[in-house]
Regions:
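Short, functionally critical alpha-helical segments immediately adjacent to catalytic or ligand/cofactor-binding
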Residues: 59-62, 75, 138-165, 194-195
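Surface-exposed patches in mature extracellular/periplasmic domains of secreted proteins
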Residues: 60, 66-69, 151-156, 202-219
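Secretory-pathway/luminal and periplasmic proteins that interact with or process carbohydrate-rich
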Residues: 67-71, 87, 152, 163-171
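Short acidic, glycine/serine/threonine-rich helix-capping segments at coil-helix boundaries
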Residues: 39-42, 59-74
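Ser/Thr-rich, Proline-interspersed low-complexity disordered segments
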Residues: 1-31, 83-92, 97-99
Length: 267
């Protein structure tokens, strides 16, 4: 059966650090040129913000880039002048971008059939959402469609935090995914909050507007400048509900991604 982690807690002491050491970056001199391969959706303003440099310096280091260019073609090898900022996170990538969005990689995936093949509480769950009664799998598809997020990712989150595919009953805590806002006790609104938070992280990182955020204990973290949008989004999501060792475990190789790969294989 899929591995289910204990529900994510804001305490920094209630979960162990991931057993696999995370990679770290070397130290860089101010303005040192580093190698970077353009990712889907990368723009020069976003890259300048992430690497703490300027668009002009990127142009100077990459004469091949036309002056009127904004969005970079994915796969373009680049040199970027980097200026160190404190608290940059690990370069470990949690999830590739193609596994985050509700896109072509999901052709042929049937959420209802997948959920019904498991013994968890989600397959018998029903709720009223979007002017209709929906089963658990239908709820996942409804939110996946509305937020353009992979239903596989939503299922992995529900399993990791709530045992939705492996446990016969939901956790006693009604705030299933950790959002303790008033009136957010339902699975529906918890999942809406999760999808919205993930999207804010994904598109905020891609645009260059989200460069840092606080964990629940007030600790500041900044995603690695090379980081992909899906991994930055998951870091942002878990920052809302955890800190310290719990945050490191949630975003490390033994965290959510372990549950994802147990369910769906290597993304």
């Amino acid at each position: 059966p899929p591995r289910t982690a204990p529900p994510c807690q804001p305490s920094a002491d209630s979960a162990p650090l991931a057993s696999t050491p995370l990679p770290v970056r070397p130290s860089y001199k101010p303005g040192e040129l580093v190698d970077y391969t353009a990712q889907d959706g990368d723009t020069l303003p976003a890259l300048a913000a992430r690497f703490n440099t300027s668009i002009e310096e990127i142009f100077a280091a990459n004469p091949i880039i036309p002056r009127d260019a904004t969005t970079m073609p994915p796969g373009l090898p680049m040199k970027i002048p980097i200026y160190y900022r404190a608290l940059w996170g690990s370069p470990y990538r949690i999830l590739p971008d193609h596994a985050f969005v509700n896109g072509p990689t999901l052709i042929g995936f049937n959420t209802t059939a997948f959920v019904n093949a498991h013994d968890g509480w989600l397959k018998t769950y029903r709720t009223y959402a979007g002017d209709a009664w929906r089963s658990g799998p239908e709820l996942v598809d409804y939110i996946a469609t509305n937020f353009s997020i992979s239903p596989r990712l939503l299922l992995a989150v529900l399993e990791y935090q709530g045992g939705a595919l492996s446990q016969p009953k939901p956790p006693v805590d009604k705030y299933l995914l950790g959002q303790r806002r008033i009136y957010y006790e339902s699975v529906y609104l918890q999942l809406v909050w999760a999808a919205n938070t993930l999207n804010n992280g994904y598109y905020g990182w891609r645009s260059g507007n989200l460069l840092e955020f606080e964990l629940t204990d007030g600790t500041l973290t900044r995603p690695d400048p090379w980081q992909n949008a899906a991994s930055a989004a998951l870091q942002y999501y878990f920052a809302q509900i955890s800190s310290g060792g719990v945050f490191q475990a949630n975003t490390g190789p033994e965290g959510l991604i372990r549950t994802y790969t147990d369910l769906f294989g290597d993304p």
